Amino acid sequence: MLKSNLKIENRLSLIGVTESVKRSKSPNGIEHCRIWLEHRSEQQEAGLIRQARCKMPIQISGHQLIHKTQGITVGSKILVVGFITSHKQTNGLNQLVLHAEHIELLD
């Protein structure tokens, strides 16, 4: 627990533009949406401005969040808040994935 009494163990918020959107349904009927999000911003560090860029896969699962993805297409600007975890890829490498718990379409 932090001194501020906030419980923030694994939380990430990211704004970016969608590069790809793929919807699917698991064999047990759970709907999923996988988005590649590209983030670009300027951040101040040690008194200097630096370019911050990343591409991150976003995993959206379950009916409550899936309906919020209906308006999201390639090029949409969105805010995603959730937790990060590592997924093992088919090539054996691990990749960080942001699992969405909140999504907002910004444009």
Swiss-Prot record:
Name recorded for this polypeptide: Replication restart protein PriB
Q: Which residues cross the membrane?
A: none
What's a single GO BP term from this record?
Answer: DNA replication, synthesis of primer
SUPFAM superfamilies listed in its UniProt record = Nucleic acid-binding proteins
Listed under GO cellular component are: primosome complex
Which family, according to the similarity comment?
Answer: Belongs to the PriB family.
The SSB domain sits at 8-107
Query: What domain of life does the UniProt record list for this protein's source?
Result: Bacteria
Q: What does this protein do?
A: Involved in the restart of stalled replication forks, which reloads the replicative helicase on sites other than the origin of replication; the PriA-PriB pathway is the major replication restart pathway. During primosome assembly it facilitates complex formation between PriA and DnaT on DNA; stabilizes PriA on DNA. Stimulates the DNA unwinding activity of PriA helicase.
- Return the Pfam families for the record: SSB_1
Q: Which organism is it from?
A: Actinobacillus succinogenes (strain ATCC 55618 / DSM 22257 / CCUG 43843 / 130Z)
Recall the GO molecular function terms of this protein's record.
single-stranded DNA binding
Query: Which NCBIfam families does the UniProt entry name for this protein?
Result: PriB_gamma (TIGR04418)
Listed A to Z, the keywords are: DNA replication, DNA-binding, Primosome
Is the keyword Amino-acid biosynthesis assigned to this protein? no
Report quaternary structure and partners: Homodimer. Interacts with PriA and DnaT. Component of the replication restart primosome. Primosome assembly occurs via a 'hand-off' mechanism. PriA binds to replication forks, subsequently PriB then DnaT bind; DnaT then displaces ssDNA to generate the helicase loading substrate.
State the InterPro entries in the record. NA-bd_OB-fold, Primosome_PriB/ssb, Prisomal_replication_PriB
